[in-house]
A protein has these predicted regions:
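N-terminal glycine-rich FAD/FM-binding segment characteristic of electron-transfer flavoproteins
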Residues: 1-276
Length: 276
């Protein structure tokens, strides 16, 4: 869905074991407003029994609208697909896993893609099917966007994520203490909601239930206490390292390795050791 999607569709067609790619292209889909995306899903759903998307900011915007148009339930936060209509999903900020059975004629899901093994982007030869886009609903209009460019890897793609909490105390400390370590190891920079709310870090790097969900090979939590909504966003990391001067910090319950130390001493020392 979108405008000028030919190259994306061609790339998607190479995914192994994929049989077809549906391409819906139109000028008015340049920014793909949520209500237009929901309408397209509604139309396409006539041919399918299961529709799923990665659990992301965008899917959480348009799929609930699509579910409402189809008069079915959206099953979000899916962690495991057990059968054709039985799923395990996260509730209560990931503290509880619920087993859900849906009897809707169409299964509409968002899944945590980081929990599933990636498939090959080569070797496929899917058929590309072009469908006409419905007329715009014109319920909302696009105003503007601001793209923050960074040489660092995206949070969702990074093998290493280093996140800072409110204990850093200021935006200056966030940049001066964490950034050198982040850049030295080629990591992505994350933040807790408390740090974002305090103005220490931008909203787009917030890790947690109301932010980005990550599952890197290594997650380093610096000055992070371990609120439920933050843990929800990083608990599936392969290895978790926590640095906090409070030995009772909740984050240590989820850490593979914990260091009880003042972050302003531990992080520079860690950086020096890595450089050596």
């Amino acid at each position: 869905m979108g405008n000028n999607t030919e190259s994306v569709a061609t790339k998607a067609a190479k995914i192994k074991d994929l049989s077809k790619v549906i391409r819906v292209d139109a000028d008015h889909l340049d920014h793909l407003l949520a209500e237009d995306a929901a309408r397209i899903i509604e139309i396409i759903s006539e041919e399918y029994q299961v529709i799923l998307a990665a659990h992301s900011w965008y899917s959480r915007n348009f799929l609930p609208r699509a579910a409402a148009r189809l008069d079915i339930a959206l099953i979000s936060d899916v962690l495991k697909i057990e059968a054709n209509n039985i799923y395990t999903r996260a509730i209560y900020a990931g503290n509880v896993h619920a087993r859900i059975q849906s009897n809707d004629p169409i299964q509409l899901l968002t899944v945590h893609s980081s929990l599933f093994e990636p498939i090959s982007n080569e070797g496929g030869n899917a058929q590309i099917i072009i469908k006409d886009a419905p007329l715009p609903l014109n319920l909302t209009s696009w105003q503007s966007e601001k793209i923050n460019k960074s040489d660092r890897p995206a949070l969702t793609d990074a093998k290493i994520v280093i996140s800072g909490g409110r204990s850093l105390g200021s935006e200056e400390n966030f940049n001066n203490v964490l950034s050198p370590l982040v850049d030295e190891v080629g990591a992505a920079l994350g933040a807790t909601r408390a740090a974002v709310d305090a103005g220490y870090a931008p909203n787009e790097i917030q890790v947690g239930q109301t932010g980005v969900v990550v599952a890197p090979d290594l997650y380093i939590a610096v000055g992070v206490y371990g609120a439920n909504q933050h843990v929800y966003g990083m608990k599936d990391s392969r290895v978790v390292v926590a640095i906090n001067n409070d030995p009772d910090a909740t984050i240590f319950q989820f850490a593979d390795y914990g260091l009880v130390a003042y972050l302003f001493e531990a992080v520079p020392e860690m950086l020096n050791l890595i450089k050596e």
